[in-house]
Regions:
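Extracellular/periplasmic catalytic domains that process cell-envelope and extracellular macromolecules
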Residues: 160, 345-349, 398-400
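Short, well-ordered beta-strand elements
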Residues: 347-361, 376, 382-387, 405
Length: 415
């Protein structure tokens, strides 16, 4: 692709201070640590960012907890945001009453990477205040959690000036960067070893034949042996970091056991050659999973160090009350209508009706609903009533009671 460069400037590299250095510097400047905001705790809904790096970062609905905000037992409300891809970011505006060092507490859910953690980088006013802010961890748990921004060892405070500030959450690999690089190097070397052995054995080796691997391809055998040692080290380090043996760590241990067996005994290579290839593929899948950093966020708060954390999980009575209201509402809710935003400036004359066939799915209807509310209605002043239907579109049109707009799948034909 063509590119035009007008100017190149070189700057000296300046490393960010550690958190201890950052904290000592701010305290020496007379900036105080905010202990309590009390009722003045600032809450920012994650589904309402000021800026996003990519259009695929959009709010979604979550009904797994009655505490998720905003929540409704019958209606679908966009109340969380889910980001997974590295280098994507979301920025929010935060206004604080005074200069100081504040904590940032997040209500989140990380239930995708079992036994692992995902990472985020937090920028304040587009600046990384200290090194550890690039490795904010969110550990695995099947339910919702609340935690102050931390690196797994200590909680952090961030400097915010009086008035408006920006807080940016960027998806990063964090402490997983080194492990991703090491596994990537292993996959390359193991693929090379596999190709060397494949030249001797063919795709389906004879399990009872002596191929002389140690004599003909000693480097390939040594590569497998070294890979086993490296995988054991990575698994042990990850288990030490996370404090538990999750699926990702167990996968590495399982692969390492086979590699160790093949590396120590060349007669085990041919019988396990097909499995060896599949385990290289499994390592690639592990790498792909590690490159994704899924995290669902409900909201975050800017608060004092002594302010209580946001409530993460609802109690029994809150949960059962929410489910009862949802059950009762199911008897009178109109599930065919994808509701529209009401606004007094829009009249009935400026309203059109749109029917969507169920073959396209409710997800498509929600996407269309979001596009209409975000772009079409504000620009045109026309609201759209949307309904998801199963059958009867042709009959309704022939009877003269059809919609203004119909969105059909390829199997629906009207002549």
């Amino acid at each position: 692709e063509p590119i035009v460069i007008t100017k190149i400037e070189l700057y000296p590299y300046e490393e960010e201070p550690t958190y201890e250095e950052f904290l000592a510097q701010k305290l020496s400047e007379g900036i105080k640590v905010i202990d309590k905001l009390g009722d003045g705790v600032i809450k920012i809904q994650a589904e309402c960012p000021t800026l996003v790096s990519n259009a695929c970062l959009y709010p979604i609905n979550d009904r797994t907890s009655s505490l998720t905000e905003p929540q409704d037992p019958q209606k679908i409300k966009f109340n969380i945001v889910n980001s997974t891809t590295v280098n994507q970011w979301m920025q929010y505006k935060v206004t604080v009453p005074e200069d100081g060092l504040y904590t940032i507490a997040i209500r989140f859910r990380q239930n995708d990477l079992i036994g692992m953690f995902t990472s985020r980088r937090i920028l304040i006013n587009n600046e990384l205040q200290f090194q550890e802010a690039s490795t904010i961890r969110f550990k695995y748990n099947s339910g919702w959690q609340s935690a102050v921004a931390n690196d797994g060892a200590q909680n952090f405070t961030f400097y915010l000036k009086k008035g408006e500030n920006t807080v940016t959450f960027e998806t990063v690999l964090g402490d997983m960067t080194d492990y991703v690089y090491r596994v990537e190097q292993l996959i390359d070397s193991l693929n090379a070893a596999y190709k060397q052995m494949l030249q001797l054995t063919g795709p389906t080796p004879d399990s009872y034949r002596d191929y002389g691997f140690n004599r003909l391809v000693p480097d390939a055998v040594q590569t497998i042996r070294d890979a086993a040692v490296e995988l054991y080290e990575i698994a042990d380090e990850l288990e030490e970091i996370t404090g538990e043996l999750g699926d990702q760590v167990a996968t590495l241990n399982t692969i390492a056991i086979l590699f160790e067996t093949m590396g120590d005994d060349e007669y085990e290579i041919a019988p396990n050659f097909v499995t060896f290839k599949n385990y290289i593929i499994a390592l690639s899948n592990w790498l792909y999973a590690a490159l994704n950093q899924p995290l669902k966020v409900d909201y975050f708060t800017v608060q004092g160090t002594e302010d209580p954390l946001p409530k993460a999980k609802s109690n029994f009575f809150e949960s059962i009350g929410f489910e009862i209201r949802a059950f009762i509402g199911s008897f009178y809710m109109d599930y065919t209508t994808v509701d529209f935003k009401t606004d007094e400036v829009y009249s009935e004359e400026n309203t059109v009706e749109m029917w969507i066939t169920s073959a396209l799915g409710r997800d498509d209807a929600l996407i269309t609903r979001n596009l209409v509310d975000t772009y079409f209605t504000p620009e045109s002043g026309i609201t759209v009533k949307m309904k998801v239907i199963t059958t009867g579109l042709t009959e309704a049109i022939l009877a003269g009671i059809g919609p203004d707009i119909a969105s059909m799948s390829s199997v629906d034909t009207i002549t």
